Amino acid sequence: ADDKRPALASPADVILYEMHHRDMSIDPSSGIEHKGKFLALTEQGTVSPDKLATGIDHLKELGITHVHLLPSYDYASVDETKLDKAQYNWGYDPQNYNVPDGSYSTDPYKPDVRIREFKQMVQALHKAGIRVVLDVVYNHTFNTDESNFERTVPGYFYRQTKDGQWANGSGCGNETASDRAMMRKYMIESILYWINEYHIDGFRFDLMGIHDIETMNEIRAAIDKIDPSIFMYGEGWAASSPQLEADRLAMKANVEKMPRIAAFSDEMRDGLRGGWDDDTKGAFLVGEPGHEMSIKFGIVGAIEHPQVISDSVNYSKKPWALQPTQMISYVSCHDDMCLADRLKATMPDASVEELAALQKLAETFVFTSQGVPFIFAGDEMMRDKKGVHNSYNSPDSINTIDWKNKTAHKDVFEYVKGLIAMRKAHPAFRMGDADMVRRQLEFLPVENTNVVAFILKDNANGDSWKNIIVALNSRAEPVKLDIPSGKYTVICKDGKINMKGLGQVSGDELMVPARSAMIIHQ
């Protein structure tokens, strides 16, 4: 009864942190008692061997606003009766949508335990000022013929191909039919149940492109009656073409038909790190030219902007968001290699210091973008997965977050923490309004490839800083930039960030060091 949603003034203020329950706490270095359980996030005062905060205290220290929990409903791939055996899965294989998974509870045999412990976790996060996002996978189920849906009304809840086969837009054996009245009703009621019963504050829709636009908008409308601040976003794609007309699908290209629902920008992600299909091929971050426009597309939040020429953007040849808060800005997530592994794969000869510098540069793009920033748990301390590309069922040894990394890469952690603090303190970085972004975010002319620079001008969005210049350089050498003449305070340089200032620069030229970002203001 005393559980309150932490305040959220605008979707532009959202900062997402994506985590898996086991990854977060299973390592001995977490210092957490309830390892791999919902209760792990209720433990305060937990520390690593070097006495640095872990778990929920780490999240508070980092400053994120929302924890995005990988699937936490009851999924099929982990056998709750055999928890003494090593089992791991992300959980994208739904069995029962409306109850927490027992493997994350302290006693899967007592039905009330998982429910109570999940609620304790939500309550603890809320008390810590953090909202909770549930990853929902209504697009397919683990079983088809033996599923609850098929047993209820055979042939109704799943789409079929013309020749009567199960359609497979999910790549997992089936795809549900959200366009049918009772599947739509099921999804809406399930979402409302998680909100009312478990106080969930947001939803991330797996393969949202399989669902239809009308269902997504009806979910948004139903949520708005309870609390419009509950955040909705999803993957604006499918694994293969769903059995429904393209103009009805909740794909990225149709986001403009879904107000206040956001989608991930793979344009920005792959413009920074390279495509998902070849881990050894890098992009902007490793100094490959030609990705600048895809990144500018991400910086403005996938909206129309006079300086973003959409023809040169990868994947999308036109802006797809009406508002910047409809775009999720990110460089890595649970899928594919995590950022540290990807950088290593694309730059095998780079030193640890060089890789750390690029990790910082990548996160600077994410947290200075007008989209909604998203970070994969552990990227703030160069977490790795030993090079595994798809770790959905890899053992803990691959997936766990080693909290000793927080000591080894303290500078990366402090830098990301600094970026988040700057974003929260300065509304210019989160305008949340497309017209304002077009008016007050201007890209500066650059002579080189692999350099992107922009100015947030005239106290953008009521900011106390009059003009803010963000310059991002992935070249192996420093670059000279022409800037509006004046005296500026340096906030970020050489992989350090300090809002009180790191010194002054004046004149109409700026030297931006190699493989790093520079942020100055007046």
Q: What residue ranges belong to the model's regions?
A:
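Conserved, mostly hydrophobic/aromatic
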Residues: 19, 69, 97, 125, ...
